[in-house]
């Protein structure tokens, strides 16, 4: 793909400076906030994109959802919730579940098969 898409992430909540950079320069961002924090971040980033003459809707946003561990029972509803508030890319995670290599693969296969159609 030309040019290579540029995605930006930050540890935790991105500062205003990083939000502006994402809006001005990035093709998308790796979101690490909660769904409750997301609308404010998205609005700041979209505003920066608009001010830079870019279409905010062209920006991608990714969030990760764990399919194992303490929140395993709610992963499908989390996928639906993220999609409803604007997620464009999804990362299903199996880390932290104490699984062996083959179990990671099997769990991911199951999760993809059960992925909500949103």
Pin down the residues of each PLM region.
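Active-site-adjacent structural elements that line small-molecule/cofactor binding pockets in enzymes
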Residues: 1-118
């Amino acid at each position: 793909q030309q040019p290579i898409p540029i995605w930006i992430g930050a540890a935790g909540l991105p500062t205003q400076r990083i939000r502006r950079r994402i809006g001005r320069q990035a093709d998308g961002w790796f979101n690490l906030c909660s769904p409750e924090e997301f609308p404010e971040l998205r609005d700041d980033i979209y505003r920066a994109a608009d001010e830079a003459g870019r279409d905010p809707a062209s920006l991608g946003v990714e969030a990760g959802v764990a399919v194992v561990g303490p929140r395993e029972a709610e992963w499908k509803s989390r996928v639906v919730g993220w999609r409803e508030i604007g997620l464009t890319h999804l990362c299903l995670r199996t880390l932290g579940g104490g699984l062996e290599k083959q179990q990671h693969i099997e769990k991911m296969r199951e999760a993809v098969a059960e992925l909500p159609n949103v």
